[in-house]
């Protein structure tokens, strides 16, 4: 619950920071709606957040059923997207991409997954269809 709420809030913040109008809708299949003010882009976003314990950072993320996001997006005239937020210990990664494209690159057969190998992540960083950002812990702190 905490990880999911954090992931949704982080995606909302980042989209808003970059000029999108956003709303948390918590509708079956989608969590967020975001659109450009000029109306040129309207997204229904299913957010998937995962936290990782030390040593488990490379474990793939199991993905939601894609069809659940398509139904409300069709009803509301939105393009279905997925946001995948993963806490990898010293870095939090967020990826945002169209669901149609995610289906072509997601691994797995029965259960679809987002691999967390460095090779896969580097390919996504260089992929023009994937928007992404990383928050890294570089500064010193006194936080436990």
For the regions a protein language model found, what residue spans apply to each?
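Mixed-charge (Asp/Glu-Lys/Arg
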Residues: 1-28, 34-144
């Amino acid at each position: 619950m905490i990880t999911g709420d954090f992931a949704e809030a982080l995606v909302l913040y980042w989209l808003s920071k970059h000029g999108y109008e956003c709303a948390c809708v918590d509708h079956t299949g989608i969590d967020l709606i975001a659109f450009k003010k000029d109306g040129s882009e309207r997204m229904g976003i299913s957010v998937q957040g995962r936290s990782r314990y030390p040593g488990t950072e490379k474990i793939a993320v199991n993905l939601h059923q894609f069809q659940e996001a398509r139904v409300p997006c069709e009803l509301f005239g939105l393009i279905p997207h997925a946001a995948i937020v993963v806490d990898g210990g010293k870095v939090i990664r967020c990826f945002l991409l169209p669901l149609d494209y995610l289906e072509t690159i997601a691994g797995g057969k029965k259960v679809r997954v987002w691999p967390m190998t460095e090779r896969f992540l580097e390919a996504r960083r260089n992929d023009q269809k994937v928007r992404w950002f990383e928050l890294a812990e570089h500064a010193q702190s006194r936080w436990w």
